[in-house]
C-alpha cells in the first residue's frame, strides 16, 4: 500500500487503514489524516515469521494514529511522522510494547534533546499510558477522553502514580526534527 492520502474516516468506527489477519505487507509513503483511527491492526501479522512494515508515512490529526489489538507484535515502524494526534499509539494487550520494532520515527511530543546535532534524539522516545488505561480497557469511556476530569486524572497519575503505567512503545532513535515530506 503506497503513495495514498487517506482522510476523514471520522464515524464511530472510522478507520483509515485496517489489517485483519494480514501478513507480509508494506505500508509506505502514505498520509493518514483526520481519522477516528488511522490504522487498526488486529492479529497482524498473522503468519509466523512475517512482518508488516510501516515506512515513511505521516499520521496526523487522528483520534488514535495506530491501534494494535493483538499481542502478536511483528510490526516494524521506521521513519514515520506522528503529529497532532490525540493518541499516537495504543497497544490493547498488556506488556506487548517490545513486540513491535520502532526506529527513527518523528514524534511531535518528543521532549528530548539533540546535543550532537545528528538529527536523532539523545534519549529514546517512550510512550506510556497513565489514565488512558481507563478508556483502553473500557472503550465506552473513550467518550470522556479529553474531558477535564480525565485530563486531571492523567496529570495526577503522572505526578504521583497510584498504578503502574503501561509502556505503549519505545523508539530508541527518534527523529529530532520533522522530516521534509516533499523530498
Feature annotation, model-predicted:
Residues 1-3, 24-28, 49-56, 72-79, ...:
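All-beta strand scaffolds that present successive hydrophobic residues in beta-strands
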Residues 4, 9, 30, 35, ...:
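Consensus "Asn ladder" position of solenoid repeat domains
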Residues 8-14, 47-50:
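Short coil-to-beta transitions that initiate beta-strands within beta-rich domains
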Residues 10-17, 36-42, 63-69, 86-92, ...:
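Short glycine/acidic-rich loop motifs that flank beta-strands on beta-rich extracellular proteins
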Residues 32, 44-46:
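Short polar/acidic secondary-structure junctions
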Residues 52, 60-61, 65-67, 74, ...:
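Membrane-proximal low-complexity regions enriched in glycine and acidic/polar residues
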Residues 72-183:
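Acidic, glycine- and Ser/Thr-rich low-complexity intrinsically disordered tracts
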Amino acid at each position: 500500500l503506497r503513495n495514498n492520502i487517506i482522510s476523514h474516516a471520522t464515524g464511530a468506527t472510522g478507520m483509515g487503514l485496517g489489517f485483519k489477519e494480514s501478513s507480509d505487507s508494506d505500508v509506505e509513503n502514505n498520509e493518514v489524516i483526520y481519522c477516528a483511527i488511522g490504522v487498526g491492526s488486529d492479529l497482524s501479522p498473522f503468519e509466523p515469521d512475517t512482518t508488516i512494515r510501516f515506512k515513511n508515512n505521516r499520521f496526523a490529526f487522528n483520534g488514535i494514529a495506530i491501534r494494535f489489538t493483538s499481542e502478536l507484535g511483528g510490526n516494524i515502524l521506521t521513519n514515520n511522522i506522528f503529529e497532532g494526534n490525540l493518541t499516537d499509539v495504543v497497544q490493547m494487550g498488556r506488556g506487548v510494547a517490545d513486540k513491535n520494532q520502532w526506529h527513527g520515527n518523528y514524534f511531535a511530543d518528543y521532549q528530548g534533546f539533540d546535543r550532537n546535532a545528528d538529527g536523532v534524539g539523545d534519549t529514546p522516545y517512550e510512550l506510556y499510558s497513565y489514565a488512558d488505561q481507563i478508556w483502553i480497557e473500557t472503550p465506552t469511556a473513550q467518550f470522556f477522553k479529553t474531558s477535564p476530569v480525565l485530563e486531571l486524572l492523567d496529570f495526577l497519575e503522572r505526578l504521583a502514580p497510584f498504578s503502574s503505567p503501561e509502556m505503549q512503545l519505545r523508539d530508541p532513535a527518534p527523529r529530532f526534527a520533522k522530516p521534509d515530506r516533499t523530498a
